[in-house]
């Protein structure tokens, strides 16, 4: 028996950093997917085949007798620890620890770009292996197992990434509680800088500033929380999509300015953001912790132009859209 499952990447639409201080955030699944085949093996072991885990920005240098790989392959290896924990958790849940399982991974999601590649591979693995072992789990139950995987590997996790990946669509998050928001099409372009910042260090930097200047930083965080609630109102409204696009774009631009004020933007991120806006995006902002990673732009009828502008500015564009589907069982073969 073989099972194929897939799970999507995610972006934080609004609320990164302020969510650490109890403010709400909105995240969404996007139509870039990780695919996991699962099947039994007769060795009683866990075997992981990573076909094409993507590490963008690969640079290879050649000298007379050596080849230097200048990419962080530690990030790709880190993904495999999520896969192993996911398989072990599902085998425990199914009480089938002795079963050998082989998983084969292919992915459209770049590693280390802040798009939830680790959560997607964990969720897809849980989905495929649970079906293989005859364990019937809802997507909500799979999201909880995905959160448990993150806790085991990372030591801390809000649960946003695996929940969005398992359930799909838009999720409003506040103080540990999730609310699924109505779906609407958002034509977006994600731009990757080619580098990633340390979430831990960036969160610590904002914390230092908050502790030293609470009267300055607190109003910024409050404003970011209000942006999230306004964005939620827009998503819940029955206004025409064109009107909602314009309103969401304005909120994105304001949110980016506040993130810049917190010090988490970089020259490259700002270049991609402003290139996207100049090319016709209604809004563009950082998604995730900042310090590198990705931005995203809302670009109805302008995705190609915005993608070209991001490329010219030195980024890697990914034309995509919000995915209403989370985890999918794609195929089951006897």
Curated annotation (Swiss-Prot):
Cofactor entry: Mg(2+)
SUPFAM superfamilies referenced in this protein's UniProt entry, alphabetically: GHMP Kinase, C-terminal domain, Ribosomal protein S5 domain 2-like
Pathway: Isoprenoid biosynthesis; isopentenyl diphosphate biosynthesis via mevalonate pathway; isopentenyl diphosphate from (R)-mevalonate: step 1/3
Keyword check for Nucleotidyltransferase: no
InterPro entries in UniProt: GHMP_kinase_C_dom, GHMP_kinase_C_sf, GHMP_kinase_N_dom, GHMP_knse_ATP-bd_CS, Mev_gal_kin, Mevalonate_kinase_arc, Ribosomal_Su5_D2-typ_SF, Ribsml_uS5_D2-typ_fold_subgr
GO-annotated biological processes: isopentenyl diphosphate biosynthetic process, mevalonate pathway
Catalytic reaction(s) noted: (R)-mevalonate + ATP = (R)-5-phosphomevalonate + ADP + H(+)
GO molecular function: ATP binding; magnesium ion binding; mevalonate kinase activity
Documented EC number(s): 2.7.1.36
Gene Ontology cellular-component annotations: cytosol
A Pfam family per the record: GHMP_kinases_C
Active site: 161
Location in the cell: Cytoplasm
Keyword annotations: ATP-binding, Cytoplasm, Isoprene biosynthesis, Kinase, Lipid biosynthesis, Lipid metabolism, Magnesium, Nucleotide-binding, Transferase
Binding-site positions, ATP: 110-120
Subunit structure: Homodimer.
Cross-referenced PANTHER family: MEVALONATE KINASE
Family label: Belongs to the GHMP kinase family. Mevalonate kinase subfamily.
Name this polypeptide is given: Mevalonate kinase
Organism: Thermococcus onnurineus (strain NA1)
Gene behind the chain: mvk
